[in-house]
Amino acid sequence: MDRKKIFWAIASVFIAILSIWTVVSQSKHFSFEILMSFIRNANKGWLFMSFVCTFGFIWFEGFALVRMARHFGYKTSAIDGTVYGGADVYFSAITPSASGGQPASAYFMIRDGIPGYAATVALLINLVMYTLSLLTIGLLCMIFKYPLLKNFSGISRIFIYWGIVVLIFLALVFYMLLRKGSILYSICDSLIRLLEKIHIIRHGDRLRIKLKNTMKEYQECSNSITGQTGLLIEIFFWNIMQRVSQLLVSFMIFMAVGEGVNKAVDVSVIQCFVAMGSNCVPIPGAMGVADYIMIDGFKQLVGSNAANMELLCRGMTFYGSVITSAVIILIGYIIRKKVAK
């Protein structure tokens, strides 16, 4: 792991601790005893289902990548896809960019014999669909559950609306990178020239020749999805399932503690608004911002128990998925190391 990854990993732990401390210390109604009581008395079946949904959030992303890899002619399994999804979820959580996990996913895909250009195309398509799926679900939530959005505080609504703007912008950027290989080539070429100037690399001309050949294959791979409406709809479906899995985590937890179906549905909608708003700032995992929006939304449903329920739901939707992803990555890395030997 390079220094940048180490820095953001340490920063993420610090921000996570600070976020949890802020939630606990600033809430007059938070009680560790009440929190533990919620956990002890919760229906274990619903809690188990919340973990299944957490795993689904990872699995569905990986399976979407597997389906694209197979379309490009490269054999890979759903188990391999779980590692790809885990790598993306984990490294996205510890870096300040929502797409920070893509290089980690690409690493495992390349290790499994998928060329870099094909992995890049697959990841870019998935990023577009991942973004569009959240915008689609978010739009439905705004139409059918607008009162929930309206009852957020002004600051939370600013975060949510700005997050929507960022999501639309990112979707357009990812699409342009996918369809216009010349843009990606210019970015890579500029990076090579910069590294040459500061004497980190030599023989930049050789790298540029290799880059041109790679970009030609990249563009051919990208063009191969033109007219493949069925494939794109399928990838969009798997991304919708990934997003739904994430939203259902809070649903399952509310059912586990006996809050009822109506509140469980509403908390899933609030979770969607949190997911959109969390894109408004370049902070690892949107820690702090996501917690603020979530508590603000939970006050509409559980009043003084908002902080306790926020820690339960945030603990599973974010920290639970990060820990699960870390375990998946570790196992996947060890297995690939043994196979390589």
Where are the regions that the model predicts?
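Membrane-interface helix starts
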Residues: 6-7, 41-50, 223-237
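Hydrophobic faces of transmembrane alpha-helices in multi-pass small-molecule transporters and flippases
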Residues: 47-51, 86-94, 124, 232-240
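Membrane-embedded helical hairpins/re-entrant loop segments and their flanking transmembrane helices
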Residues: 60-86, 90, 253-270, 294
